Structures are given as C-alpha cells and as structure tokens.
C-alpha cells in the first residue's frame, strides 16, 4: 500500500497533499506519525465525546494495521470508507443513539475542526442533506453519499 500511495503522491497537487497532511495532523494528536487509541480518545474528548475503551478498540480494528499518513492518504484517495465506517463515525457523536444529530452541532464541529467553511460552503454542504426539524439523519445521508439508497431508520 505504501508504494501505491507514494506513486499517487507524485501525481497530486502540492495543495491537496498539504490539506491531507493537515487533516492527518489534526487526528495525530501526539504527533508520533500514527493514529493511536490515545489520539482518537483525545480528539473525541475535544469534541465533547468520551468513547470507552471498547469503542476505541473497535474503531482501530477497522484499519488493516497501524494508521500512518501514507495509509490515511491511500484510504482518502481510494474513497473506500464503507457505509458502516462512515455511519460509525457519525454515531460517535450520537449520544441519544437515535441516528440523528442536531444540524447546528454538526456545523459547529466542522467549524471547530478547522475546516474553515464559509456560510455559502456550509449551506451547499447541507443543501441535499436529510434534515428534518433541525435534525441531521446521518444514516440516510451515508446511504445517499455511498449510493446504496438503503434506509435503515
């Protein structure tokens, strides 16, 4: 996987590589070059969520090995996140476990994570999103972006 990713790196614009590095750096809290259980716990706590050890272990098991920048980049470029993986990422913030999140909370998360969305970008991001009564239905959204059309509500 490392060779394939390095080959892709030479073809990517420097700006895109830099954006990917910044995204990885936000996740790699201890800056050791790998995403660890402690990194995931720290970033979750920054976002107001405290996952237990079982949840953290389950998240790390989704990766085929230690997650370094090259592996992170390969995953992002191949777009291989499964529907379940994406749903699980949203579920981390779903304290009511009702498969819905407050849309304002999602917008705040995006702003807090340094994505620098302006109002127009934020509006466009959620223009087609399944939002009813201020609640973002992440199961429907995930099915929509992955093209499964499944509705597991």
UniProtKB/Swiss-Prot annotation:
Gene3D superfamilies: EF-hand
Location of the EF-hand domain: 15-50, 81-116
Ranges annotated as spanning the membrane: none
GO cellular component: myosin complex
PTM-bearing positions, type Blocked amino end (Ala): 1
Family matches, as InterPro entries: EF-hand-dom_pair, EF_Hand_1_Ca_BS, EF_hand_dom, Myosin_RLC
Stored Pfam families: EF-hand_7
Binding-site list for Ca(2+): 28, 30, 32, 39
Function of the protein: In molluscan muscle, calcium regulation is associated with myosin rather than with actin. Muscle myosin contains two types of light chains: the catalytic light chain, essential for ATPase activity, and the regulatory light chain, a calcium-binding protein responsible for Ca(2+) dependent binding and Ca(2+) dependent Mg-ATPase activity.
Name recorded for this polypeptide: Myosin regulatory light chain
Lineage: Eukaryota, Metazoa, Spiralia, Lophotrochozoa, Mollusca
